[in-house]
Amino acid sequence: MQIGIDVGATKIESVVLDEKGNESNRERTDCPKDYFQIVKTIKEIDKKLEKKFNKELPIGVCHPGVHSPQTGLVKNAPNCYWLEKKPFQNDLRKELGKEVFCENDANCFALSEALDGSGKHYKIVYGIIIGSCLLYTSPSPRDS
């Protein structure tokens, strides 16, 4: 069994998968806007799930942005500004007291689709995650 955690701008979602990849548990909570509260929330989720399943579980965390190989700091996480320039993976490892694997959320999405999703029968899989918004500012419809 293993824990997967998806950290986003507004939520933290956790899932526990069994050895065959079947979902055993799924939970969602609001994402705090404070960096240390997020680390604490992930620790609480981890401990709660380990207690529920009565064993230590490996954990992987996906989030916007990437870890700089030179510094270990997160960069390019515009929707999760609280992650910018923070040693997220190292802080999680220290707080949880075990190995924590962190990866960019788009990379995790593409890997999941390639391994057991819609791309599992293909040699090459291209994953796209787009957060987008269209703004109409001149003249504003609200000004009408």
Question: Could you tell me what each predicted segment is?
Answer:
Residues 1, 13, 63, 126, ...:
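Conserved beta-strand and immediately adjacent loop positions that scaffold enzyme active sites
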Residues 2-40, 74:
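Short glycine-rich, Thr/Ser-proximal phosphate-binding strand/loop in the N-terminal lobe
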Residues 2-6, 58-60, 125-129:
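Short glycine-aspartate micro-motif
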Residues 19, 70, 142:
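Short, ordered coil/turn segments that flank beta-strands lining enzyme active or ligand-binding pockets
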Residues 136, 141-144:
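Single conserved hydrophobic/aromatic residue that forms the stacking wall/gate
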Residues 32, 39-43, 47, 57-59, ...:
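Glycine-rich phosphate-binding loop and adjoining helix at the ATP-binding site
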Residues 64-67, 131-133:
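Short glycine-rich anion-binding loops that position phosphate/pyrophosphate groups of nucleotides
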